[in-house]
Amino acid sequence: MSTLEELDALDQSQQGGSSNNEGLDGIEQEILAAGIDELNSRTRLLENDIKVMKSEFQRLTHEKSTMLEKIKENQEKISNNKMLPYLVGNVVEILDMQPDEVDVQESANQNSEATRVGKSAVIKTSTRQTIFLPLIGLVEPEELHPGDLIGVNKDSYLIIDKLPSEYDSRVKAMEVDEKPTERYSDIGGLSKQIEELFEAIVLPMQQADKFRKLGVKPPKGCLMFGPPGTGKTLLARACAAQSNATFLKLAAPQLVQMFIGDGAKLVRDAFALAKEKSPAIIFIDELDAIGTKRFDSEKAGDREVQRTMLELLNQLDGFSSDDRVKVIAATNRVDTLDPALLRSGRLDRKLEFPLPNEEARVGILRIHSRKMAIDDDINWEELARSTDEYNGAMLKSVCVEAGMIALRQGDTKINHEHFMDGILEVQMRKSKTLQYFA
């Protein structure tokens, strides 16, 4: 079998060789059949083709070297133009220019790409100059929008870089970097308020798809009102700790500024920062400082406070409102707030924080004393009955005073009598019935 296979392979190789010889013979026959004049003309044509190819090769090589030199020169120009410091400016408007509207100067080193007409820009620099740029610079026009902060060359005014958005330093300080340690389990007697706040603020951020499926638009904000010491700020801190959203805490008295328009600018910057870092929660404490009912006044300070509140109304449900930014407001004087703040579409969910009842007082006392060394024979129900009309802050003071009394007496554990003495200590400070509303 091996001998037959070798013979077949030899026959195939001979057939392939004969076919190659036939091809060579065919070429040789064609050349042999041609005359001398035809061969000379073919040779001259080939030589001309070679000369044309060589000249084309030389031209392309020269163009390549020229383009490399231009690229190197342009890179040096770009590096020189990008040398710091930049001149800071703002984009006023982006324009679409037609070819017949721009007069492009003719020069020897300009090509079709350099004279290409596209988008132009109007900018305003920090030196209060308004400048028109036929060529924008190193930033793509699609990335620029009116109002953007930019860095321009101080000589040619070409846009070199797009700078990050500028916010007031006071607004940046409002962002809570370290999350609070409070949890919902640290709040006693407010289970209904916790559930409603979770449904209105946290749930739309964590499970937005459920709201979209049902076609329900979640509330934009939540207003917490009630007497002092009932846990409004504590619940807001727990909400910040349990949610993964950016949390901005601002007190309404911070928004009352001396200069006209300064408070409204703080409100705009706070909401702009929240939109940039969305989802976000803005907590406004002591809302009654800026949210009082509007009235006619000749004092500039009163008018400035009202302008600040109007800016807050615009941010809550104006053209620039954002569903990914939730607002939590807290106040002790809900009766003095402007009706425009309380209407639906702004602060939709209203949560009342009343004084805790007897069952809630038991839960609050247990929460504040769970890390304390206490006896097992403490009657929490009796302590709750003895602390009628106490708010959560006063109940915490009772636990602190009981611990101080036990420490003063040298005891190693806090018993029921210590708590009763603590109640008397807090009661002496409460000289009269607390009235927080006029």
Swiss-Prot record:
Domain of life where this protein originates: Eukaryota
Keyword Amino-acid biosynthesis carried by entry: no
Alphabetical list of SUPFAM superfamilies matching this protein: P-loop containing nucleoside triphosphate hydrolases (SSF52540)
Organism this protein belongs to: Schizosaccharomyces pombe (strain 972 / ATCC 24843) (Fission yeast)
InterPro entries per UniProt: 26S_Proteasome_ATPase, AAA+_ATPase, AAA_lid_3, ATPase_AAA_core, ATPase_AAA_CS, NA-bd_OB-fold, P-loop_NTPase, Prot_ATP_ID_OB_2nd
GO molecular function: ATP binding; ATP hydrolysis activity; proteasome-activating activity
PROSITE patterns reported for this sequence: AAA
Stated name of the protein: 26S proteasome regulatory subunit 6A
PANTHER family per UniProt: 26S PROTEASOME REGULATORY SUBUNIT (PTHR23073)
Amino-acid positions noted as binding ATP in the UniProt annotation, renumbered to this chain: G226, P227, P228, G229, T230, G231, K232, T233
